[in-house]
Every structure is written in C-alpha cells, then in structure tokens.
C-alpha cells in the first residue's frame, strides 16, 4: 500500500496504473474510519482494479461553529485498517497541499443543496463539491464510492458529475449499522453512554416508517408525522428535520409512487446525527 501526502505523487501513480490498463476506484473520506468506510473500500475493490482512498478533513465544508477542530483524527489507525482491506493507495494531504493559496474558485450545486442538511449548514455542500471536484481531477477515477448515509451528499455529487461531465461513475453504498441499529458515523464517538442509548431512536423511527410503507401507507405526511412522534418520545433527542423526498431530485413528496427517501437529522445532546431510509431502490 502506497501512502502519500503529495498531489504530484498521486498523479504519477495513477498515470502509471492507467497505462497498464487498470480501472481506478476512489473512496473519498475524512478519516477516523469505521466499518461503514471499510465497506466502501470493499465495494470499490469489486468495481475496480486499483483502489485509492483519500483521507482529508476538509476545512471548507465546516461552518464557523461546527466541529472542524474537534473532528476525530487517527491516521495511524486508519492506515492499518486500509492495509488490512487491501487498499492500494492512500492520499492524506495537509490543508496546505489541497489549498496552497487563497481559494477563489468553488463548485456549487444549486437548489438541491438548499434543503435537508443544506438548509441548516450554509456553505457545507459548496465545500463538499469543491473538494470532491478537486479529488476527481487529482485521481481521474473511473468509479467513486459514496455512502448512502449521507444521502443528500450522494445526490449532490451525482448532479455535479452529470452537469460538469466528470468521466466517473458514482456508486452508492448501503448504510452500515451497529448491531443495535445505530448508523455508523465517525461522530458517534462524541456520544456519552446515555446519549449513545438515546441515539437508537433515529433508527427506531425509520423502522416505524418502514412498517407503515410495508403496510401500504403512501401518504408522505402520515409517515413524517409518525417519525416525528417516535423521535420526540426520546427526551434527549432534538429534531432538526424529518423529510420525505425523491432520492435523486430531493423534491418533497406528498405521495410516494415508487422511490422515496425518508431523511432525518437530530441533535442527541450536542451531537448532530443523520440517518435515512431509502425505499423502492435496491443498492
């Protein structure tokens, strides 16, 4: 496994691999890897011949009062995990390597970034699309794998790829959960034992939504109401939003015809957690 913090090295390595006919897979991460991230690496391995992982806590996607400085980091541990998974290349740049001078060019996807998480985290998705566009230019991957847990992020990146003709296929990977149902997240480390228990209310509320859907309920408001009810039954849970949208366009649904995404964001104590249920689409 090659580890580098230099863009020029990545370019040379990828060029060499492409010349030998290899298909390049990319998994962009912010590090502090968990089983969810590792599942993305495994999916990338299935769809490509050479798997690269980027580890970069991207400052431009964090708001002024968010957790950039506090965000967990452990490169040594991450590298051990990636080596075990058979990853080929790890790119772990410094902020100076990614943004050597004042950043005057950004990539911004309109409309679909203004709702769900985007409504509460202004500028977040502009930071995400800008860094992902940079990574796509650095790696020129054939495929890139993103987790469904960040459903809005997947939709936004897919739209950017479509609109700007990036020659990369975006593969969506299913949410990986702890044995008790909590969606895996690097931020789960912030939760104290009481909050960790309370956080199960997110997946429980989505299970209730799934029950309704399986029983034939198609009215989005009925489902949203039920999810809110379950979430509000947990005293430590403060709901930020519950939405029922189309998974690709993120347009609000009133009636569920085929595909739907039930997306939620909550604060458990001071920790913001997201989760979702994808209905009518197999990934």
Curated annotation (Swiss-Prot):
Alphabetical UniProt keywords: ATP-binding, Cytoplasm, Ligase, Nucleotide-binding, Pantothenate biosynthesis
Q: Which residues form the active site?
A: 37 (proton donor)
* Alphabetized GO MF terms: ATP binding; pantoate-beta-alanine ligase activity
- Give the catalysed reaction(s), semicolon-separated: (R)-pantoate + beta-alanine + ATP = (R)-pantothenate + AMP + diphosphate + H(+)
Q: Which Gene3D superfamilies match?
A: HUPs, Pantoate-beta-alanine ligase, C-terminal domain
Chain residues that bind beta-alanine: 61
Q: Where does ATP bind?
A: 30-37, 147-150, 176, 184-187
Enumerate the transmembrane spans. none
Output the SUPFAM superfamilies linked to this UniProt entry: Nucleotidylyl transferase
Name this protein carries in UniProt: Pantothenate synthetase
Q: How does it assemble?
A: Homodimer.
> Hey, which pathway is this one from?
Cofactor biosynthesis; (R)-pantothenate biosynthesis; (R)-pantothenate from (R)-pantoate and beta-alanine: step 1/1
What InterPro entries does its record include?
Answer: Cyt_trans-like, Pantoate_ligase, Pantoate_ligase_C, Rossmann-like_a/b/a_fold
GO cellular component assignments: cytosol
* E.C. designation(s): 6.3.2.1
Record carries keyword Manganese: no
Q: What is its main location?
A: cytoplasm
| GO BP: any one term | pantothenate biosynthetic process
Miscellaneous information on this protein? The reaction proceeds by a bi uni uni bi ping pong mechanism.
Residues given in the record as (R)-pantoate binding sites: 61, 153
An example of a Pfam family matching this protein is: Pantoate_ligase
Q: Where in the cell is it found?
A: Cytoplasm
The record's similarity note reads:
Belongs to the pantothenate synthetase family.
């Amino acid at each position: 496994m090659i580890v580098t913090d230099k863009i020029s090295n990545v370019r040379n390595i990828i060029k060499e691999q492409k010349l030998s006919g290899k298909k390049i897979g990319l998994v962009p991460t912010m590090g502090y890897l968990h089983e969810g991230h590792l599942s993305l690496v495994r999916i990338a391995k299935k769809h490509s011949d050479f798997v690269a992982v980027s580890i970069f806590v991207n400052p431009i996607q964090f708001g002024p009062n968010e957790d950039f400085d506090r965000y967990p980091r452990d490169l040594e541990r991450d590298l051990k995990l990636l080596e075990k998974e058979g990853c080929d290349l790890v790119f772990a740049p410094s902020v100076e390597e990614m943004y050597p001078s004042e950043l005057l060019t950004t990539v911004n996807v309109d409309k679909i970034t203004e709702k769900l998480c985007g409504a509460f985290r202004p500028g977040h998705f502009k930071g995400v699309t800008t860094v992902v566009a940079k990574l796509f230019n650095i790696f020129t991957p054939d495929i890139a794998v993103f987790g469904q847990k960040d459903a809005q992020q997947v939709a936004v990146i897919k739209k950017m790829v479509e609109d700007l003709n990036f020659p990369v296929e975006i593969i969506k990977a299913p949410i990986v959960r702890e044995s008790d149902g909590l969606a895996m997240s690097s931020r789960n480390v912030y939760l104290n034992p009481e909050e960790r228990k309370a956080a199960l209310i997110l997946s429980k509320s989505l299970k209730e939504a799934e029950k309704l859907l399986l029983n034939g309920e198609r009215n989005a408001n009925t489902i949203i109401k039920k999810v809110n009810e379950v979430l509000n039954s947990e005293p430590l849970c403060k709901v930020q939003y519950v939405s029922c949208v189309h998974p690709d366009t993120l347009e609000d649904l009133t009636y569920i015809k085929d595909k739907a995404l039930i997306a939620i964001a909550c604060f458990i104590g001071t920790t913001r957690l997201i989760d979702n249920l994808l209905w009518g689409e197999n990934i």
